[in-house]
């Protein structure tokens, strides 16, 4: 496959034409009486018309046939997608999942949509407030099928296997250690090349943004130039009665048939697009004096709530970096948090837990549920002689953090068959080191 080209920049006002049809963008207006090449003009709105310019999201698509050219939608029963946060009783315990099992292609072919499983979530889709965390487990490409989400934005984190994603805006190749965001309403189809697994953070009613940098300054963390947007590409392909458009609407899946490929956009312009980002480009900020900094310094993207400084969801990574803090317990500290913390692992291991937390698995530490380094990590980090050291080389852990109290689904607790019933035992060996007659502990040699 030829190397794909992209446009650079987060949230930019962009325009793109398929080079096979030069001049396909109208000049000086959005919807002329007759578009170049006799295309249809269609606007895709990601915000209310009256939002301030700084938050107004929309794109104009110039396509061979408009999206409305389909037969009626009908409800389908496919995958394990849900928005029912009350199907099992709440569980405040620390939860950890072993790597989620990918179905074997020799037993059953499963594509991205049929391999979607909702793990946990909170909020209300109908009021555009909340989120869901999904796991996708698939072994075959989507053939003459596409998907779009009426409920929210998908932040997709592939863990195993490359994703070739066809969108109405063009094509993206997304590999492990990259992420992509497919925003609300955008149609896409995914080709896979092997048994494939990954994580999805879905947010309702808001879009992902770059976090404010404050005293960090003008540069740092995820820089806007490193986000890549696909360039226009179209196919004029007839599929008589055989192309299926799948829609997630109010948490349910629906399907409609049409006679053509939906990827028939010859040109587009706007600021409402899909995009991808390579996590290796994250510019890490860290403590260079003492103490363990809060993990918010590792925020890649945030979906803000109406409360200043409080997110519906943050996407946070724990990338390779230097650890140099003096007189400091360097691993993550013990913590009880008003936020919910879901963690996943793309590759390698996580610094606070060397065993049990594996690539393709996950953990959930719910609101105010205590968590922190396991006993082995505490003993080693408390006694090691401190020197500058590399941390997390060859690894990439991440966190979906939310101000919402997340409910785990029946699939997450039971049907996945991946819940680690012994997770709590990693803290059982912790013991008291209290020395009431000696304030100053001995320094490590």
UniProtKB/Swiss-Prot annotation:
| Pfam family name, one | HgmA_C
* Positions of post-translational N6-succinyllysine modification: 414
GO annotation, biological process: L-phenylalanine catabolic process; tyrosine catabolic process
Which tissues does it occur in?
Answer: Highest expression in the prostate, small intestine, colon, kidney and liver.
GO molecular function, a single term: metal ion binding
Keyword annotations from UniProtKB, A to Z:
Acetylation, Dioxygenase, Disease variant, Iron, Metal-binding, Oxidoreductase, Phenylalanine catabolism, Tyrosine catabolism
Q: Per UniProt, where does Fe cation bind?
A: 335, 341, 371
The chemistry this enzyme catalyses reads: homogentisate + O2 = 4-maleylacetoacetate + H(+)
The pathway entry for this protein reads as: Amino-acid degradation; L-phenylalanine degradation; acetoacetate and fumarate from L-phenylalanine: step 4/6
Q: Which domain of life is it from?
A: Eukaryota
Provide the positions where the record notes the PTM N6-acetyllysine.
98
Q: What is its EC number?
A: 1.13.11.5
One GO term describing the cellular component: cytosol
* Cofactor(s) this protein cannot do without: Fe cation
Upon changing residue 230 to S, the result is:
In AKU; complete loss of activity
What role does this protein play? Answer: Catalyzes the conversion of homogentisate to maleylacetoacetate.
Write out the similarity annotation.
Belongs to the homogentisate dioxygenase family.
Q: Which disease is it linked to?
A: Alkaptonuria: An autosomal recessive error of metabolism characterized by an increase in the level of homogentisic acid. The clinical manifestations are urine that turns dark on standing and alkalinization, black ochronotic pigmentation of cartilage and collagenous tissues, and spine arthritis.
Q: Could you describe the subunit structure of this protein?
A: Homohexamer arranged as a dimer of trimers.
Protein name in UniProt? Homogentisate 1,2-dioxygenase
Q: Highest lineage ranks of the organism?
A: Eukaryota, Metazoa, Chordata, Craniata, Vertebrata
Gene name, per UniProt, is: HGD
